[in-house]
Amino acid sequence: MSDSKDSKGKAPQKPNDAEQTPGGKLTPQAAEALLENNPSLKNELGGLDKDKALEALRKMDISELLTGLSLTGKNKKDMAAFKFWQTQPVPRFDEAASNAAGGPIKMIDPEKVSKEPDALIEGFEWTTLDLTNEEELRELWDLLTYHYVEDDNAMFRFRYSKSFLHWALMSPGWRKEWHVGVRATKSRKLVASISGVPTQIRVRGQKIKVTEINFLCIHKKLRSKRLAPVLIKEITRRCYLNGIYQAIYTAGVVLPTPVSSCRYYHRPLDWLKLYEVGFSPLPRGSTKARQITKNHLPSHTSTPNLRPMEAKDVDAVHDLLERYLNQFDIHQAFTREEIDHWLVYKESPQKEQVIWSYVVEDPETHKITDFFSFYNLESTVIQHPKHDCVRAAYLYYYATETAFLDDQKALKNRLQMLMNDALILAKKAQFDVFNALTSHHNPLFLEQLKFGAGDGQLHFYLYNYRTAPIAGGVNEKNLPDENRMGGVGVVML
């Protein structure tokens, strides 16, 4: 949820050469770093007595909420002013992190929700995007392509395909009115957007209807107009009118207040290409040949009875995934229709493939015992003489019957086999890098399968819902920790 790369926390970022090692408590130095890396916090708390300004920040549970706060300036761009978030139904920084009482923060009376949007600044007007209209889809694609997500050094920029936008924004139950845009009145040019899709999630067993907020994007020339809070308020109003009072979103910046925080990991599939475009460094003392050899993958998968997922597998995968995700504190509560939409590739000559899903079918019982999936998100390589894009595969959902055996060693072995096959299949599909978070049971295989730590952190947020902090799969040193699993079981695009 942001007009900058930091809102995603997953821009095409370089792996991190050096480990960050923030302490388990928010020290005065770390609190000052938090202010430094979030300009709006610094600006709006700057008028207060320094000790008072830092006191609220020190009350945060750093090990749960801010593990791995980037101290390298990666959090420089703010999604919206800190003052704005003080007016919203979100947990405050100074609330006790151990408060386990879960539930809505504010009860919404739909009769009191405005039927009309707030007025925009002169020269701009609201619009509702029709993504079934090829021209309006192209406008959104154009805005996102040139103004959405870019790395700090302007070397890489996300390149969402139109097929990806259809997949991401037209899931079951999608509403046209939740695809919000802002146009320049005179030119009619689309200059800002925010989108949401409806779904249900479970938070510590409580099933709630939410809107997944995404693609908050503002034209670079309008970043000073403070449109982000206005866009957030407008999508909130439209959701309220449809009876949805909670939302889930992610950001790479620290806002009030993360429910969890995961770290990105990257596994090179074409190391030489990643090195040539500046994504992967050449480690000191190593050589190109050594790095290519280190990241080499077998030509063939090793899991018996592995095959691409088909429409006939939807019910079995739905059952397996639902049982698996129930092990996590926060996760999506999928419907059968959502499984079909999100996981089944429907070949079409007009559309690029976005999702790759595979199942393991027992040849005797024909039961689906395992499945995994990954999706495609390319990045443009800006002004490079040889390469124009990096193809990144993002680990999506997976599940395995082995997870129910109460045998972590067996689960670790099974996931390492499955995920190594995912890497092989992604390599065969011409992907250059495979990305994954420390969510789910990912700490069981990330380091063993030669994923490298990234400098991207993804913070998870709930709007108008309070719950105690949820483990993000990392420890106080921001490293994958098998003892910190079982928290995040949701994947946000």
Swiss-Prot record:
Gene source species: Emericella nidulans (strain FGSC A4 / ATCC 38163 / CBS 112.46 / NRRL 194 / M139)
UniProt GO cellular component terms: cytosol
Compartments in which it is found: Cytoplasm
Quaternary structure and interacting proteins, as annotated: Monomer.
GO terms for biological process, alphabetical: establishment of cell polarity; N-terminal peptidyl-glycine N-myristoylation; protein localization to membrane
EC number per UniProt: 2.3.1.97
Gene name tied to this protein: swoF
PANTHER family linked: GLYCYLPEPTIDE N-TETRADECANOYLTRANSFERASE, N-MYRISTOYL TRANSFERASE
GO MF, one example: glycylpeptide N-tetradecanoyltransferase activity
PROSITE patterns: NMT_1, NMT_2
Family membership: Belongs to the NMT family.
Pfam families xrefs: NMT, NMT_C
Residue ranges, annotated region (Disordered): 1-30
InterPro entries: Acyl_CoA_acyltransferase, NMT, NMT_C, NMT_CS, NMT_N
Keyword Cytoplasm listed: yes
Keywords: Acyltransferase, Cytoplasm, Transferase
Principal location class: cytoplasm
Record's function text: Adds a myristoyl group to the N-terminal glycine residue of certain cellular proteins.
Binding residue positions for tetradecanoyl-CoA: 82-85, 216-218, 224-228
Reaction(s) catalysed (UniProt annotation): N-terminal glycyl-[protein] + tetradecanoyl-CoA = N-tetradecanoylglycyl-[protein] + CoA + H(+)
Protein name in the entry: Glycylpeptide N-tetradecanoyltransferase
Active-site residues from the entry: 493 (proton acceptor)
